[in-house]
Amino acid sequence: MEESRAAADADVSLHNFSARLWEQLVHFHVMRLTDSLFLWVGATPHLRNLAVAMCSRYDPIPVCTSLFGDTSDTTSTGLAQRLARKTSKQVFVSYNLSNTDSNFTLLVENRIKEEMETFPEKF
């Protein structure tokens, strides 16, 4: 029983980090699973939307869809698609910031990429 729990724990990695972007404190929570990645981005503890993206052998652009939340807000799906392309994994993204300005979103994405370069084993 303990061996199977240890093996299961080795397949899951949790990583949390925060950044102050444009005077807003943004929190990032990453859960790396065996073949997938879950990323939550937000300032308050809410899960307002969820998107998923994954690579396909039929198209170089990863397929993506919104699982729940406001489908007119494509921030989560776009970020999931770009991260799926970068990691070659199935990526779930929940982007829960009210500021969806493209410049701010780019700052958020750059902070994620910076963290990926610093801690590749967490992604």
Swiss-Prot record:
It comes from Mus musculus. This is Proteasome assembly chaperone 4. It comes from the Eukaryota. The keyword Zinc does not apply. InterPro entries: PAC4. The keyword Transcription does not apply. Keywords: Chaperone. Chaperone protein which promotes assembly of the 20S proteasome. Belongs to the PSMG4 family.
